[in-house]
Regions:
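HKD-type phospholipase D/PLD-like phosphodiesterase module
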Residues: 6-51, 63-140
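Structural motif
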Residues: 54-58
């Protein structure tokens, strides 16, 4: 399959103001098979960010107290610390159904509050059908 078959054309992307390429040579992707490997790599990358760097994320269930490695920090502390260092932290988290229905309403709200208190921005997104959800997880 040709590279052009994998990516949208500039017209299909629909954002003529963007100068971001859809592809670049020498890209590297490393599969992280287990959650502990993922969280350890995430912690290393986020801790290396400095003022003016960007951290964008989406989340379905944002447990702010989830530890990224033994002894901490939690995901909330990790992202809040980045915001406190001047990293531009922006998140889009699913605005969960009520906790009474065994969902993650409080956790998602608390993750956003912790990051926003440190200077980041987290929006709760509920653009779904009734009873639906955004099952999304992404960090850039």
């Amino acid at each position: 399959m040709a590279t052009d078959d994998w990516f949208l054309s500039a017209r299909e992307r629909g954002n003529p103001a963007s100068g971001l390429p859809d592809w670049c040579e020498d890209s590297h992707a490393e599969p992280l098979i287990h959650g502990s490997a993922y969280f350890a790599a995430l912690a290393r990358e986020v801790e290396a960010l400095g003022p003016g760097d960007h951290l964008f994320f989406t989340d379905w269930r944002g447990d702010p107290d989830e530890r990224v490695r033994d002894g901490g920090p939690s995901i909330g502390e990790l992202f809040a610390s980045a915001a406190g260092r001047g990293v531009i932290v922006k998140g889009l988290v699913w605005r969960s159904h009520l906790d009474a229905m065994a969902y993650s309403e409080e956790e998602n709200r608390h993750l956003g509050e912790e990051i926003e208190a440190a200077g980041g921005e987290v929006l709760l997104d509920q653009r779904v059908r009734i009873g639906g959800s955004h099952h999304q997880k992404l960090v850039v």
